[in-house]
Amino acid sequence: MSSAAQSDGNLLAAKSRRLGEHLRSLGRLLVAYSGGVDSAFLAWAAYRELGDDMLAVLADSPSLARSQMQDAVAFAQERGIPLAIIQTAEMERSEYRKNDGFRCFYCKDELFTVMEQFRAEHGFSVIAYGVNTDDQGDHRPGQGAARQHGVAAPLLAAGLSKQEIRELARAADLRIWDKPASACLSSRIEYGREVTPEA
């Protein structure tokens, strides 16, 4: 192994340890879970560190493809990750249906509002989601909603990039390590065109 490769490996191992330490510091944890690489790896890592003091929360929404939802449920079951399915109603919000450049804000605001109610009712301490270092700097209104709701970002706190998350997932033999990125169904509708369940 070259010294550069060894250095990269040491850095990634350090980030993985940092992630574990951060997760343990959060207490009873809800993870916003969609089945994508980031949220699936975060849910797995949280379960590894916290056991039954974590719960992955999957939103059953018209904007989530049925095949993606089924795969998300299957992955959680395969890994023994505790899972709850909640209902969100972003389609009932006129500002979401309007489909301007802030649609993702209203979607995440709906998600985190419902998760916050769930958190309070079931005695969890913190909500976390799977944003990473590559998500910084783009137009990401959903991150604004996360900040407003005080949602933790453990992968970001550990300094993990998308590629590093894939590498750690592969090392852990998680089948999602090479899963392609997949946007929600609503993102396939051009801005300015109303979003409806039928669109």
Predicted regions and their residues:
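ATP-dependent adenylation/nucleotidyltransferase module used to activate substrates
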Residues: 2-171
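Mid-to-C-terminal catalytic subdomains of enzymes
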Residues: 156-199
